[in-house]
C-alpha cells in the first residue's frame, strides 16, 4: 500500500534502504537474479516521496522543459504532474472535459511543431470495456498549477474483444500510436493513427506479436509461483526520440527492439530483443526515454519509489 503521512518515518527508512542498496549495486538480491541477462547500467536519479505521486503508472520526458518528467497516477482524479528528474513535484495540472476510467501510460511527442502529451485511458483489468480513450494535450509552456483541455481525443476499440493494455507509445514521425497488450502471451502490438481525420470510434489495427518475451524458469516458478507468472506482463512502452527503438517494460524486464531505417515495426518486434533485468522497483509501471534519447527513466507505483535513469 502507498505510504501515508502517519508513516513518514517508515517511508524515510525504506527510502534510505533503497538508496543504500542502489549505491551498493545490489538493487536486487542474488537469489532474485536467476537469469543471466547482460543488462544496461542504472543509477538512482531520485526518489518519489510526495504523497500525491503515490501510484505512478505513466511517465514521459518533457522536450520543452529541461530535466522535467511528466507523470500521472493509476488511481485518483485525473491529474498530470510535472516533476524533476530527482523526483520532486513541480506543478499539478487538472484535465478538463474527459471522463477518466483507468489511466495507464503516457507519451511526449512533437507534431508539426507542437509539443504534446498523450494520456492513455486504456486499462481494463476486468476485460469489460467496449471502448477506450486516448487524450492529446498541448504540453504546458509554464510549470505552474493550471487546468488543461485536450487538443483532441481518440475513442477506439480492439478488433476482437476487450483486453488489458498498460503500454502505449507514440511514433510521431510515422503518425502512429503503438499499443501493447498486457496479459496476452505472446504480447500483441496494435497501432492507431496519431491524428485521425474524424471523430468516430476507431478500431485498432493488429500489427503483430512481440518476440523474445522471457519465460520463468523452473526455479523461479518454485520460489515465487505467483510472481513468476506476472513477471512478463507488459506495463509500459516508449519509442526513442529518433524513432529507432521500441522499449517495453514488464514487471521484471526491460526489452529493447531496435528498428532499421524505413523498417516497419512488425518486422522489428519479430526479432529477438535485447533483454535485461530492471533495477528494483516496488511495482514497475512507468518508463520513457530521456529527452536526449541517451537513456531511459523508470519508476513504479507506491511510495517511496526509486526513480532510475537506465543507460542501455
Question: How should each PLM-predicted stretch be described?
Answer:
Residues 10-13, 25-29:
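Generic low-polarity alpha-helical segments
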Amino acid at each position: 500500500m502507498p505510504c501515508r503521512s502517519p508513516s513518514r518515518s517508515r517511508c524515510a527508512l525504506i527510502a534510505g534502504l533503497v538508496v543504500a542498496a542502489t549505491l551498493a549495486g545490489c538493487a536486487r538480491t542474488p537469489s532474485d537474479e536467476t537469469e543471466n541477462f547482460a543488462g544496461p547500467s542504472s543509477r538512482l536519479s531520485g526518489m518519489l516521496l510526495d504523497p500525491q505521486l503515490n501510484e505512478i503508472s505513466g511517465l514521459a520526458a518533457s522536450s520543452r522543459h529541461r530535466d522535467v518528467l511528466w507523470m500521472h497516477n493509476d488511481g485518483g482524479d485525473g491529474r498530470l504532474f510535472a516533476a524533476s528528474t530527482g523526483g520532486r513535484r513541480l506543478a499539478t495540472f487538472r484535465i478538463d472535459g474527459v471522463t477518466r476510467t483507468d489511466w495507464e501510460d503516457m507519451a511526449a511527442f512533437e507534431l508539426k511543431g507542437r509539443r504534446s502529451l498523450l494520456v492513455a485511458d486504456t486499462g481494463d483489468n476486468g476485460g469489460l470495456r467496449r471502448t477506450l480513450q486516448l487524450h492529446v494535450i498541448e504540453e504546458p509552456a509554464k510549470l505552474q498549477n493550471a487546468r488543461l483541455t485536450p487538443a483532441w481525443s481518440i475513442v477506439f476499440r480492439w478488433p476482437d474483444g476487450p483486453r488489458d493494455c498498460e503500454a502505449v507509445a507514440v511514433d510521431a514521425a510515422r503518425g502512429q500510436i503503438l499499443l501493447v497488450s498486457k496479459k496476452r502471451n505472446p504480447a500483441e502490438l496494435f497501432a492507431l493513427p496519431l491524428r485521425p481525420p474524424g471523430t468516430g470510434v476507431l478500431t485498432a489495427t493488429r500489427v503483430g506479436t512481440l518476440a523474445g518475451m522471457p519465460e520463468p524458469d523452473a526455479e523461479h516458478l518454485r520460489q515465487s509461483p505467483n510472481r513468476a507468472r506476472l513477471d512478463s506482463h507488459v506495463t509500459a512502452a516508449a519509442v526513442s526520440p529518433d524513432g529507432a527503438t521500441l522499449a517495453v517494460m514488464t514487471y521484471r524486464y526491460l526489452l529493447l527492439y531496435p528498428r532499421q531505417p524505413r523498417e516497419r515495426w512488425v518486422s522489428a518486434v519479430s526479432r529477438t530483443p535485447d533483454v535485461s533485468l530492471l533495477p528494483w522497483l516496488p511495482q514497475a509501471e512507468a518508463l520513457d526515454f530521456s529527452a536526449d534519447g541517451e537513456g531511459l527513466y523508470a519508476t513504479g507505483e507506491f511510495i517511496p519509489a526509486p526513480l532510475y535513469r537506465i543507460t542501455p
